[in-house]
Amino acid sequence: MAALGRPFSGLPLSGGSDFLQPPQPAFPGRAFPPGADGAELAPRPGPRAVPSSPAGSAARGRVSVHCKKKHKREEEEDDDCPVRKKRITEAELCAGPNDWILCAHQDVEGHGVNPSVSGLSIPGILDVICEEMDQTTGEPQCEVARRKLQEIEDRIIDEDEEVEADRNVNHLPSLVLSDTMKTGLKREFDEVFTKKMIESMSRPSMELVLWKPLPELLSDKPKPSSNTKNYTGESQAKHVAAGTAFPQRTELFSEPRPTGMSLYNSLETATSTEEEMEL
């Protein structure tokens, strides 16, 4: 209560009319500058914050908090958005082919690929770029292909060498010699085998070998065997018995038919000629 009796330093205590007078206009004789409307220049209602005052910093803080909340809400909406809507928005945001071509053209000009490209049209630019890329990438591709072919050839050669090294002698064809042949070779009969033929047996090859058998194995004159004599005697006895039986049968058939004697006579001559040929 004591403070109410104290004078306030911010207000004048004099009871003059200066305290109750409205503020003086900026231009004497006019309320507002020329060409300005009073409604536009009228002060807005509400507290006005000075930039250097604490109220201004608080207002800026509220604006930043509001922006953060807005961005956070937009991110949540993007997360809840269905996939189809996202794809549509991405397709809308994607640049068209002309934009891509322009970007490529700018990159080409920036890197200085070919200064004469700038005067060409867009299809001509693309053709020139493709030709330059083919020229730069053609040589490495040839080198890569040549290197691969060389690797394949080296691998095939290595495999062949391994097969030759792993090949065992037991798998090769062998020649079995008899005891007489071995003894003949020990006596160094050049007529039977030569040294070259013996060496060729260790290798898988096809060669013509001429061999002369020993005299004790094959004689010049063949010996007559008794089996052949017995066989010839038995065959002659069989033919004689068949010849005696066959005429008796012909006689039995010829008795009731005397008119057919000429036919049977021809048959007898035929059988006799056959017997002579067999003998």
UniProtKB/Swiss-Prot annotation:
Keywords: Coiled coil, Cytoplasm, Cytoskeleton, Methylation, Nucleus, Phosphoprotein. One of its GO terms (cellular component) is mitotic spindle. The modification Phosphoserine is found at S53. Residues 141-168 form a coiled coil. The modification Omega-N-methylarginine is found at R48. Residues 63-72 have a biased composition (Basic residues). Residues 224-235, 262-272 have a biased composition (Polar residues). Facilitates DNA repair, cell cycle progression, and cell proliferation through its interaction with CIAO2B. This is Coiled-coil domain-containing protein 117. It comes from Homo sapiens.
